[in-house]
Amino acid sequence: MKFLFLFLAILLAMEPVVSGRRHMLRCMGDLGICRPACRQSEEPYLYCRNYQPCCLPFYVRIDISGKEGKNDWSRENRWPKVS
């Protein structure tokens, strides 16, 4: 019984082991991921600090003009309209 408590104390005192996968570098306000090549469902947009493309999901829209216009993605044309 003492051996069991000793084993549990040692097990709880050890730091958790992280798998060998590298930490993913996030970009565009945590909407994208920096990768060497984007997946089929992602679009490359600009570049990250490590000179890899920032891969955004296809449904993310980026307005590079900085102002909202009268296009399909403007505030007035969004669905659903809240009154």
From Swiss-Prot:
InterPro entries: Defensin_big_dom. The keyword Transmembrane does not apply. It comes from the Eukaryota. One of its GO terms (cellular component) is extracellular region. Keywords: Antibiotic, Antimicrobial, Defensin, Disulfide bond, Secreted, Signal. Residues 1-20 form the signal peptide. The keyword Cell cycle does not apply. Its main location: secreted. Disulfide bonds join C27-C54, C34-C48, C38-C55. One of its GO terms (biological process) is defense response to Gram-negative bacterium. Transmembrane segments: none annotated. It is found in: Secreted. PANTHER family: BETA-DEFENSIN 119. Belongs to the beta-defensin family. Has antibacterial activity. This is Beta-defensin 119. It comes from Bos taurus.
